[in-house]
Structure formats: structure tokens, C-alpha cells
């Protein structure tokens, strides 16, 4: 990240504020003061957390927590790249929070709070900022997380939003990508392929009569309730953002082994199964579902002797998990279907 001379938290002396606009685009009427919009839009997002210092200072002060590790993750999204430019901004806000929460879930970390950065396109109106803040507030209450600070700027480019999330994990118990061993089972939460199909539905390329797949794409469900079961049973994990095949391969690479994915055992929703039933080639259809991404499920390595106990613990947390493959000697990722080896035509999304 490039160095910045700007303050790391939103506060009353920032030059660029939540409602900042170019002078040429400013309305004739005087805009609200910085105190007004910080108090009205941003301060409520702190939910009274003393760490945020009411957004009156240049930094947040985070107390240490003996016996715990601080887990930090960051995601950024750009209009026209990660979401449609015309997407409702409360939806954008909620997806930003949920993708970060999914990263913490993969580490079995308890979410604590977040720092926010927004690059508003020049000329953005007050209503846009209000809608964005509403989405943050809704999910802040839903997931019990608070805004701790951040920054806003005005840009000549598209809307850019970024969040840095903090979470706690008992010392030494953070689940990493490395840790899988040959013989471990590959297991995944929820269902696979709905996020990708939801994106296609948003483009009008697939039918989504009840809107279930579109909801999965726009508002993923981070598996934050799975952390206790993971701490006991998971040896390595990742969240499924780039695609099940790609993210499984990340675990294998970090762990120094190979992962084999059984395409026949992919857990599918009724909508995904209906789509698959219409495909002329089952294997290619399953590869598409396993490489599409945006599922935000948890894929993990579990000792074979722990697999059943993990299922039970996950079910108690309200999450279904399925066994979909195994780790073996070697490197990389491979797939098979009905006992026959398959070479995937793609694994998932690549980051530039």
C-alpha cells in the first residue's frame, strides 16, 4: 500500500469528509458541517465502542487482550469490477463487510471491528452516502461489529470501498491455510456454485425465479458461527471466494501436498442442481460450479477421525458441512467424477 499523509480515522479536521465534493459540483446551499455528518452518519456506526473515541481523534486505541492473537484482514472493491456500477449502495456496503467477515471466519477468529476507507466519485450526492451508511449500520447490528475509524476521499474514478477487519483468536489457535496432511479429508460448508450463478442471473444469463442465487451473490452469509467447531477440528482452511477448486489449491500449496476434489459430491442447492440438470455435459457443469467463486463458504482440511465430529459440531452451529475430497502426497489440485480422473479446464478467479 502506498504511504499516505492522511489521518487513519475519520475525524473533524479531515480535509476530505463523508460528503466531500469538488467545489465546482457543490450545491449553492451550504453543506452540513463536518460535525453534522460525522455525528449523523459515522458516529452511530461505532455503536458506542470506546476504542473508536467517538471518531474525535486521529487514531483508535485498541487494548491488548491477554491470551489472544489479533487477526487482521483487508478487502477492497471497485465499482465496475467487483460490483455493478449501478448496484444499490447499501448492498455494496453489506457485501464489503461480509466478505471481510468471511476471511475472519476462515481463520476461526471472533470479529471485533473494522476500519473503513471510501473513495467517492466526484459529485456523489448526500443520498448515496446515506444509503451506504445504512447498509453498514444494518450489518453492524446483525454481526455485532463496530466502525473503529477510517478515511474518505474524493476521486475522479469509480467508487472504491475498502475495509480492514480485526478479530480475536485464542493464542496459537488461528486456522491457517497451511496445516493439511496427506490423508486429511477436504470438507466444505453450505452449498457451492450459487454465488457464480447469482452473478449470471444479475447479467440475465440464467433463470433465478425466486431470486435465491442472486441473494447469495449480493449478500453472502459469512460462516462466523463455525469458528468454535473449526478450532477443535479443522487443521487448515480458506474461504471460497475465488472458487472451490482454486481455494482448495491454495490450502494444498501452503500445506505442501495435493488435494483431490470429488466433483460428484459437490453440495448443491436446488437452484444449482436445476441449472446443472440442464447442462449437456455434467463434468463441465460441475467444474463451472466449483470454479465460479463468490460462495464465501469455508473449505477446510479435517483429520479423517474427526470428520464425523466436525459435522456434528457444525450442525450444532447451524451449518451443514460435506466431505468432498482428500489430501494426498504431491502438489497442486486434481478432480475426479464417478471414479474417473478429470482435468479441470479452470480453477477459479486469478488476481492481477
UniProtKB/Swiss-Prot annotation:
Substrate binds at residues 82, 294, 349. Mg(2+) 2 binds at residues 75, 103. Mg(2+) 5 binds at residue 242. GO terms for biological process: thiamine biosynthetic process; thiamine diphosphate biosynthetic process. One of its GO terms (molecular function) is magnesium ion binding. Keywords: ATP-binding, Kinase, Magnesium, Metal-binding, Nucleotide-binding, Thiamine biosynthesis, Transferase. ATP binds at residues 150-151, 177, 241. Its EC number is 2.7.4.16. Catalyzes the ATP-dependent phosphorylation of thiamine-monophosphate (TMP) to form thiamine-pyrophosphate (TPP), the active form of vitamin B1. Belongs to the thiamine-monophosphate kinase family. This is Thiamine-monophosphate kinase. It comes from Caulobacter vibrioides (strain ATCC 19089 / CIP 103742 / CB 15) (Caulobacter crescentus).
Amino acid at each position: 500500500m502506498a504511504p499516505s499523509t492522511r489521518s487513519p480515522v475519520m475525524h473533524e479536521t479531515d480535509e476530505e469528509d463523508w460528503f466531500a465534493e469538488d467545489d465546482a459540483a457543490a450545491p449553492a446551499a451550504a453543506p452540513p458541517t463536518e460535525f453534522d455528518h460525522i455525528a449523523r452518519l459515522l458516529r452511530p456506526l461505532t455503536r458506542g465502542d470506546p476504542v473508536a473515541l467517538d471518531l474525535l481523534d486521529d487514531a483508535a486505541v485498541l487494548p491488548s487482550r491477554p491470551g489472544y492473537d489479533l487477526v487482521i484482514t483487508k478487502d477492497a472493491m471497485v465499482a465496475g469490477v467487483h460490483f455493478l456500477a449501478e448496484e444499490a449502495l447499501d448492498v455494496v456496503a453489506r457485501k464489503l463487510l461480509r466478505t471481510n467477515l468471511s476471511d475472519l471466519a476462515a481463520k476461526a477468529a471472533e470479529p471485533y471491528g473494522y476500519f473503513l476507507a471510501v473513495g467517492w466519485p466526484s459529485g456523489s450526492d448526500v443520498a448515496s452516502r446515506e444509503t451506504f451508511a445504512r447498509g453498514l449500520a444494518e450489518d453492524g447490528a446483525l454481526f455485532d461489529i463496530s466502525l473503529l475509524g477510517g478515511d474518505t476521499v474524493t476521486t475522479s474514478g469509480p467508487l472504491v470501498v475498502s475495509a480492514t477487519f480485526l478479530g480475536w483468536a485464542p493464542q496459537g489457535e488461528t486456522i491457517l491455510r497451511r496445516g493439511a496432511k496427506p490423508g486429511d479429508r477436504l470438507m466444505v460448508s453450505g452449498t457451492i456454485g450459487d454465488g457464480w450463478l447469482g452473478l449470471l442471473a444479475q447479467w440475465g444469463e440464467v433463470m433465478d425465479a425466486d431470486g435465491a442465487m442472486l441473494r447469495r451473490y449480493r449478500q453472502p452469509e459469512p460462516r462466523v458461527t463455525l469458528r468454535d467447531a473449526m478450532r477443535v477440528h479443522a487443521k487448515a482452511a480458506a474461504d471460497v471466494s475465488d472458487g472451490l477448486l482454486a481455494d482448495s489449491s491454495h490450502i494444498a500449496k501452503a500445506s505442501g501436498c495435493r488435494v483431490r476434489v470429488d466433483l460428484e459430491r459437490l453440495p448443491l442447492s436446488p437452484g444449482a442442481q436445476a441449472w446443472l440438470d440442464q447442462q449437456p455435459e455434467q463434468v463441465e457443469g460441475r467444474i463451472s460450479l466449483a470454479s465460479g467463486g463468490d460462495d464465501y463458504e469455508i473449505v477446510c482440511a479435517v483429520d479423517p477421525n474427526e470428520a464425523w465430529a466436525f459435522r456434528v459440531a457444525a450442525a450444532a452451529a447451524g451449518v451443514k458441512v460435506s466431505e468432498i475430497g482428500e489430501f494426498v502426497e504431491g502438489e497442486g489440485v486434481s478432480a475426479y467424477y464417478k471414479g474417473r480422473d478429470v482435468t479441470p479446464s479452470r480453477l477459479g478467479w486469478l488476481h492481477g
